UniProtKB/Swiss-Prot annotation:
A GO biological process held by the record: double-strand break repair via nonhomologous end joining
Domain-level remarks: The N-terminus (residues 1-113) forms a head domain that is structurally related to those of XRCC4, XLF/NHEJ1, and SASS6.
Name recorded for this polypeptide: Protein PAXX
Post-translational modification: Phosphorylation may inhibit interaction with the DNA-bound XRCC5/Ku80 and XRCC6/Ku70 heterodimer (Ku complex).
Organism: Homo sapiens (Human)
Length: 204
């Protein structure tokens, strides 16, 4: 099974036109171990980030009452699914609140400088395009499966018994056995040894 895509949501939630995209990203250390977690908010022109370091993330988890090994990504995914993400912008800073869990989690974000934000926004755009393309392929495959006719299964081996003849066509009905020529009517299955003869009407 493919791993889950990084969660994201649009803000504000609800039927209003979206103005921001909020997503998370896990960072990897050189040894391949998960080294951190960051939240991002963008309006497609500017980018805000939590800019966590391993130490600042550990301090934040301790303040939230979370263990050092606990991943915040599932909490963010659940908040996105429940539309429980709130954003507040203040000049070059932003605050993000995740509710809907045992306790609300609040994060402070700083504006990312343009040269550093550009490659991240490019990666986000390409990643979203790939996800849309993948979803369209799955949808097309599901629609093709739904409209294609289902083939009735056929028996694997040869048919051992022939169907009974149709009584309406003059054939024998079910359970009627054909009599072979010369077969005895008294003892079915035995042929008469004496040839059948006619009646002589000329005898007196």
């Amino acid at each position: 099974m493919d791993p889950l895509s990084p969660p994201l949501c649009t803000l504000p939630p609800g039927p209003e036109p979206p103005r921001f995209v909020c997503y998370c990203e896990g960072e990897e250390s050189g040894e391949g171990d998960r080294g951190g977690f960051n939240l991002y908010v963008t309006d497609a022109a500017e980018l805000w980030s939590t800019c966590f370091t391993p130490d600042s993330l550990a301090a934040l988890k301790a303040r939230f009452g979370l263990s050092a090994a606990e991943d915040i990504t599932p909490r963010f995914r659940a908040a996105c699914e429940q539309q429980a993400v709130a954003l507040t912008l203040q000049e070059d800073r932003a605050s993000l609140t995740l509710s809907g869990g045992p306790s609300a989690l609040a994060f402070d974000l700083s504006k990312v400088p343009g040269p550093e934000a550009a490659p991240r926004l490019r990666a986000l755009t390409l990643g979203l395009a790939k996800r849309v393309w993948s979803l369209e392929r799955r949808l097309a495959a599901a629609e093709e499966t739904a409209v294609s006719p289902r083939k009735s299964p056929r028996p694997a081996g040869p048919q051992l018994f022939l169907p009974d003849p149709d009584p309406q066509r003059g054939g024998p009905g079910p359970g009627v056995r054909r009599r072979c020529p010369g077969e005895s009517l008294i003892n079915p299955g035995f042929k008469s040894k004496k040839p059948a003869g006619g009646v002589d009407f000329d005898e007196t």
